[in-house]
Each structure stands twice: as structure tokens, then as C-alpha cells.
Amino acid sequence: MKIILLYGGKSPEHDVAILSAFSVISAVYFDYYQVQLIYIDKTGQWVKGPLLTEAPETDEALRLTWDPTGNVVEGFSGRVISPGDIKEDNAIVFPVLHGPNGEDGTIQGFLETLDMPYIGAGVMTSACAMDKIMTKYILQAAGIPQVPYVPVLKNQWKENPKQIFDKCEGTLLYPMFIKPANMGSSVGITRAENREELQNALQEAYRYDSRALVEQGIDAREIEVAVLGNADVRTTLPGEVVKEVAFYDYNAKYIDNTIQMAIPAEIPEEVMKKARDYAKSAYTMLGGSGLSRVDFFLTNKNELFLNELNTMPGFTEFSMYPLLWENMGLKYGDLIEELIQLGKKRYEQQAAFE
């Protein structure tokens, strides 16, 4: 069977997706699978690369290059294709794409149109989980605790910034965290200690989206639970992000590597159980399939607040999701195999509906 590895993308998380894709390829059981590289560059070009029968030595090999004249260029080369050209039988797509145009339902909808099986959440789940404001509303209806928040539309802020500032300061206390509604990997997220910083933070968030979320900042640990499954949902013991920086931002996660992880987290057993229960409930409520990573805040009073549900978590060698499953006894290669089988099963079940 062929795995069509779809990676890269136009989002600011392009480079993260390449690192994740390399880790996935390195764990694939090539005795059973071939891997077809489909690279989406930063301009949105789809590039078909080689069919791999073994893992490349470095992630740089995945940054496919091509020559419009068709000449071979240095390194792995490919040719520009139309997106629909990826369709083929006896294949499953692994969309290792983070952020907008990757895990927000757009690619998932495209693959549904092509009638191809793929790994991960479906269209509705991807779209809702990617939208931080929509996720808040859904989880609030499910009774899952979250930190206080204020959604802010860009046009509202432009028309009457004082009203927005007053609303935020009347509902929340400083520090606040300001996030684009549709973005991941801490891209565009800023901490604000006063009104001036709040204004600058909103401007930063609006670089990425026309909707922003202002959240109450709290002194808390960051706890994460990995989820796996379709109808039968499994969860891991929680892990903890042990920060050496004040804010676990994009650079800390993927560039500076200034974070450490405690797996499993050193937390009371009852808190551990509650985190797993909330993770399963959130996953089920959002209609999850395949995989997700559910992130929580844990206060010194052992209060849990669900932060977000990530339908395509990072798969780099130091990413929390595969490490959490490794702690449960599921090796990286076996995890990839389970995800393939879950994707195939979901496709078969969808095809059986009238």
C-alpha cells in the first residue's frame, strides 16, 4: 500500500510540518509501505516528489526543488502538479500540515471530494477545533472548564477600540493572552500586561486572522493528553511541558528547543484521571477521529482548564504526542500503523452510509 505524505503548506507552520513529515517517514514500516512525497511549498504550489522505499537521511531532503523546464536539480526533485493529480487507488493520504489550509478542514474537504481515505479528523472536527472561539463555545456547552475569555472581531476593534479595551478589562485581569482565532503552534500569540501591550497584541493577532481571542492569563502548569481512536477512544497518561521560558511560544517549541517534558506528569492521580476524562469528552464532543492532543492548564489548586484540542499535533522527534504514546508502550512505528488503520476504517464506515 502507498502512503501519500502531504506536507509543507502555506501556513506559518510550514517548517514545523516538514520536521513532522521527516519524523513520520523515519518511523514508517517500509517493508509494508511505500511513501509518495507531495510537497506544498510556501506559495501553494503542489510538487510531486519521488516514491520512497526508505527514509531520507535529513529533513532537508523533503524541501523539494524543481525546474520548470523539467531538468533534474540538486537533491530530491519533483514536478509541479494539480492538486487533483494525487488521487490514486490503494493509497491513503497522511496530511502532515499544521495551521490554516492544513488542519482547518480545507484539505480534509478536498480529500473527501477526491474520495480518498486519509489520516486524522474529518472536515467538521478539523474546522471547529482549529477555530479557538468555536471550540470555546462547544466545550462550554459540554461543561468542560476553560479560562475566562473575550472574542474580539477586527472590525469591532477598529470601529471602537476603547469599547473593546473596556470590555476586556471589565471581564479579565492582566496578564492576558491574545491569540488569532485560527492558528496553531503559538503563532501570533502574545502576553499583555497593560492596555498598551493589549493593543499591540491585538495588532499582532490580526496579522494572521480577522478574529482574535483574549484569554485570562493564569499561573498554571501545562498538561497534555494524547488521544487515539475513532469510536473507541484511548488516552495516555498526561505529560507536562516544563518551561524554561515565561511563555511556551513558537520559538521555544520548534527552534530554540528550550522546553523539557515530564512524561508522565507528576500530578495527583485524581487530576490525572480528570484530565483523561475531559480529553476524551472533548474529543468525542467535537467528533474526533484518528488522533488529537488535548492541552490543559493546571493551577496550584489542582484546577484543570482545557486550553485547546489539536487535531494534527506535532510529530517531530521531540513532540509530546508520539512521546506520550511511547510512554504507554506504543512505539512510533506502531503508532503510525494504527493511524493508517484508523484512517482506512473511517473511510470504509463513511462509504457505508446512505
Cite the ranges covered by each PLM segment.
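Short small-residue beta-strand/loop micro-motif enriched in glycine and branched aliphatics
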Residues: 119-120, 186, 259-262, 317-321
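A short acidic/small-residue loop/turn micro-motif
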Residues: 54, 241-243, 312-313
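Active-site nucleotide/adenylate-binding loops and adjacent lid/helix of ATP-dependent enzymes
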Residues: 1-7, 11-12, 19-22, 26, ...
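ATP-dependent carboxylate activation and anion-phosphoryl transfer catalytic cores
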Residues: 1, 7-9, 268-354
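Short, active-site-adjacent cap segments at secondary-structure transitions
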Residues: 43-48, 184, 221-224, 304
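Phosphate-binding site of ATP-dependent enzymes
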Residues: 190-277, 298-305
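ATP-binding N-terminal substructure of ATP-dependent carboxylate-amine bond-forming enzymes
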Residues: 1-119, 123-124, 128-130, 134, ...
